[in-house]
Curated annotation (Swiss-Prot):
Methyltransferase; part of the gene cluster that mediates the biosynthesis of citreoviridin, an inhibitor of the of F1-ATPase beta-subunit. The HR-PKS ctvA accepts acetyl-CoA as the starter unit and catalyzes eight iterations of malonyl-CoA extension and four iterations of SAM-dependent methylation at C4, C12, C14, and C16. The KR and DH domains selectively act on the first six iterations to generate the hexaene chain. Keywords: Methyltransferase, Transferase. Belongs to the methyltransferase superfamily. Citreoviridin inhibits mitochondrial oxidative phosphorylation by binding to the beta-subunit of F1-ATPase. Ectopic mitochondrial ATP synthase is a factor that mediates HIV-1 transfer between antigen-presenting cells (APCs) and CD4+ target cells, and citreoviridin can completely block antigen-presenting cell (APC)-mediated transfer of HIV-1 at the APC-target cells. Inhibition of Ectopic mitochondrial ATP synthase by citreoviridin can also lead to suppression of cancer growth by activating the unfolded protein response. One of its GO terms (biological process) is methylation. This is Methyltransferase ctvB. Pathway: Mycotoxin biosynthesis. One of its GO terms (molecular function) is methyltransferase activity. The keyword Chaperone does not apply. It is an enzyme of class 2 (transferase). Pfam families: Methyltransf_12 (PF08242).
Amino acid sequence: MTFYQLSDAEGADNYYNPLLLWWYDFWVHWVSALFAWKCSSKNILLPFFLSNIGSRHCDVGVGTGYYLSAVRKRQPSWPQDKLTLVDFHIRCLRKAANRVGIADRTECVLANILEPIPIQPERQFDSISLMYVLHCLPGASKDKGRVFANLKPLLKDSGTLFGSTLLCRGVRQNWFNWLLQRIYNAVDMFQNRADFPDDFVRALEEEFEEVESVIIGTVLMFKARKPRR
């Protein structure tokens, strides 16, 4: 496993200790997904992930490696090329890389995606994923849109950028959703009080010729192709 540190991010692990990462999958991908977000990780987001990944993939905001691990179980030969993990948290990178279990083909990049990521153009990817990342970033959705501009140079002309984010605006929330988002925003685990779906879609359309999006429950799912050069 190759490790690159492209930002001084080691101090950003307040909420990403080993115990929380162990608990994360059960709470986020089962309890919260089904009863709060109303968008199943297993039945909706995982098939979405599977349908968009390429042989040379970059996963941004890796969490515990839930989606990557699930892909490996279904497609043991994937990825055919290098797998690149990008995150702002060292523990998440280590957890995800160990869980995927292909150290010889995995590189970890510690970086802040709100800033340009200095990965060389010849290392462009067939696919880039942003699953449940944007709602954790600081700022309003209009500001977070620059993430797409920062990632676009890393994508091949034939590649796909795709992802999902939890919305606090422009969606109907049940009481459980409302309570969780209120708590998570209060402790800065989420920062999506000023996130609007239209802002994300507009930002994608500025950077890509083809953009698709859909809201399921309180989750915005999006994918973009044909990066504007």
